[in-house]
Amino acid sequence: MTTTVAVVGATGRMGQLISQIVEASDEFELVASLDSKGELSDMLGADIAVDVTLPAVSQGVVEYAVAHGMNVLVGTSGWTGERITELERRITGNLAVGVVIIPNFSVGSVLATSFAQMAARFYDSIEIVEAHGASKIDSPSGTAVRTAELMSQARGSRGPVQAPHTDQRARGQQVASIPVHSLRMQGVVAKQDVVFGGNGEVLTISHDTLAPSAYEAGILLALRATRTARGVVVGLDRLIDMDGSRERATQTAPTGAASGPVDDGGPSGQAATVTSA
């Protein structure tokens, strides 16, 4: 049985990509395509809604869907920790709906953010440089915001990072005390560098999205999770086996137990590097 999908923001790049993936899948059926200014009532009747609109529009789309008992997959930037906490309060007690918020559908990007979160405990000088195509309106990106927030959480008692001269505009926007610098230019799909400065060394965790195909696996994974989600789920990392515990559980299962498919291929359309100088 297929799951019907309504895409809000279907005319944008991500909306077009998600629509193509849905139409090509045997698991899902596209039943409504709305632009960011479309009538939200047009998505009613679908099993799940996908919001890939604009930061100023996204919250209204999600609230409308939740109010009508629809699960929502959110791929729009601008969902800060404060907005997510507010959303969690709104749907507390409503066990019938779920909202899955994915700042970045790229598996490589999620891994790079996880590596940065690990490194944040060991360095006090940290900055983020992110780049996207010239058509991306908002800045900093949702990925950069989530990376900064997760690194800040990981630092715990170490407190805020060292960020001198942040009163100067060229020093970037501070997110969770971490300076973030945003580039918007032609020829770029998506790129993020997290730079850590230490005593006599610099560590850079870098991820480049080279083609939209980098998002396909993550989009399908998120769509599947949205079907049965309850409450608020944030990040692709919540949906994949980040620490290998699920795989180990499968390997130790009794003989004859069913195991999931194994993909030995690396993610397409992306490149990740960790460098230390």
Swiss-Prot record:
It catalyses: (S)-2,3,4,5-tetrahydrodipicolinate + NAD(+) + H2O = (2S,4S)-4-hydroxy-2,3,4,5-tetrahydrodipicolinate + NADH + H(+); (S)-2,3,4,5-tetrahydrodipicolinate + NADP(+) + H2O = (2S,4S)-4-hydroxy-2,3,4,5-tetrahydrodipicolinate + NADPH + H(+). NAD(+) binds at G9, A10, T11, G12, R13, M14, G75, T76, S77. Pfam families: DapB_C, DapB_N. Pathway: Amino-acid biosynthesis; L-lysine biosynthesis via DAP pathway; (S)-tetrahydrodipicolinate from L-aspartate: step 4/4. The active site is at H132 (proton donor/acceptor), K136 (proton donor). (S)-2,3,4,5-tetrahydrodipicolinate binds at G142, T143. The keyword Amino-acid biosynthesis applies. GO terms for cellular component: cytosol. Keywords: Amino-acid biosynthesis, Cytoplasm, Diaminopimelate biosynthesis, Lysine biosynthesis, NAD, NADP, Oxidoreductase. InterPro entries: DapB_C, DapB_N, DapB_N_CS, DHDPR_bac, NAD(P)-bd_dom_sf. GO terms for molecular function: 4-hydroxy-tetrahydrodipicolinate reductase; NAD binding; NADP binding; oxidoreductase activity, acting on CH or CH2 groups, NAD or NADP as acceptor. Its EC number is 1.17.1.8. Its main location: cytoplasm. NADP(+) binds at K37. One of its GO terms (biological process) is lysine biosynthetic process via diaminopimelate. It is an enzyme of class 1 (oxidoreductase). Residues 245-277 are annotated as: Disordered. It is found in: Cytoplasm. Catalyzes the conversion of 4-hydroxy-tetrahydrodipicolinate (HTPA) to tetrahydrodipicolinate. Belongs to the DapB family. PANTHER family: 4-HYDROXY-TETRAHYDRODIPICOLINATE REDUCTASE 1, CHLOROPLASTIC-RELATED, DIHYDRODIPICOLINATE REDUCTASE. This is 4-hydroxy-tetrahydrodipicolinate reductase. The gene is dapB.
